[in-house]
Amino acid sequence: MNLIEQIEKEEIARLTANKTIPAFAPGDTVVVSVNVVEGNRKRVQAYEGVVIAKRNRGLNSSFIVRKISSGEGVERTFQLYSPLIAGIEVKRRGDVRRAKLYYLRQRSGKSARIKEKLVSKAAAAAKAAE
């Protein structure tokens, strides 16, 4: 392991010490809590949408969340280990066969829906036993 990888690994450990990042994938509906500073006030803003892309690059990992806001599609890119992200919550798991869901940009309405990934009873029982 070279020096840069070692430093990045230590930085990731430092940034994730006070928060947990859940496992999520493209197709999942997530709520990203973002720290917003307005003047001297600091508040948390929730951004809910579908993850259409995830970029795994160590410390530079990022993901794109798409939502429909007043009839208009809005996409926002988040850095996974950014201090501006207060937390990430997975609302529902999506069942998709692609890593990048850029085709959702051309779709609207019912054709832009993503099927929910259903967990089998055996997997649910194993998870409950943990």
Curated annotation (Swiss-Prot):
Gene3D superfamilies given in the database record: 2.30.30.790
Pfam families in the record: Ribosomal_L19
Keywords carried by this UniProt record: Ribonucleoprotein, Ribosomal protein
S-S bonds: none
Cellular component, GO, one term: cytosolic large ribosomal subunit
Molecular function via GO: structural constituent of ribosome
GO terms (BP aspect): translation
Function: This protein is located at the 30S-50S ribosomal subunit interface and may play a role in the structure and function of the aminoacyl-tRNA binding site.
Recorded family membership: Belongs to the bacterial ribosomal protein bL19 family.
Protein's recorded name: Large ribosomal subunit protein bL19
